[in-house]
């Protein structure tokens, strides 16, 4: 892995893949992010991020069964790897440390 630093969108994608678990494929991940974050995501950005996270070893994928509903096309399902889980935990720890160190008066 090229370090365990995640960009904001990478973190969101990894967390969403974990949330969707067995239903984590490109379009579903994109729709879930758009719904939860009220933020539009292009299919190209989604695909590029999923590929990049898989190349980094943070995700793994498998092809699902072909269905007539999709014209025989198979969905590529994603799963967070152990390395991906570790990267998410490290990112969470950094964020929690930062929040813990913000003085109460900073937001008054």
List PLM regions with ranges.
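Basic amphipathic alpha-helical segments that dock to polyanions
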Residues: 46-53
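Alpha-helical residues within the helix-turn-helix
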Residues: 31, 54-55
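Amphipathic alpha-helical dimerization/coiled-coil segments
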Residues: 83-108
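N-terminal helix-turn-helix DNA-binding core of bacterial DNA-binding proteins
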Residues: 4-45
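Exposed loop/turn and edge beta-strand positions of beta-sandwich/beta-sheet ligand-binding modules
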Residues: 74
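Beta-hairpin "wing" of winged helix-turn-helix
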Residues: 56-71
């Amino acid at each position: 892995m090229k370090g365990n630093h995640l960009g904001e969108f990478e973190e969101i994608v990894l967390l969403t893949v974990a949330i969707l678990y067995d239903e984590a494929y490109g379009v579903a991940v994109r729709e879930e992010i758009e719904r939860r974050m009220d933020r539009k995501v292009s299919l190209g950005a989604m695909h590029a991020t999923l590929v990049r996270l898989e190349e980094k070893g943070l995700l793994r994928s498998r092809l699902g069964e072909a269905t007539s509903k999709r014209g025989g096309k198979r969905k590529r399902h994603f799963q967070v790897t152990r390395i991906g889980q570790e990267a998410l935990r490290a990112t969470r720890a950094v964020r929690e440390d930062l929040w813990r160190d913000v003085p109460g008066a900073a937001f008054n």
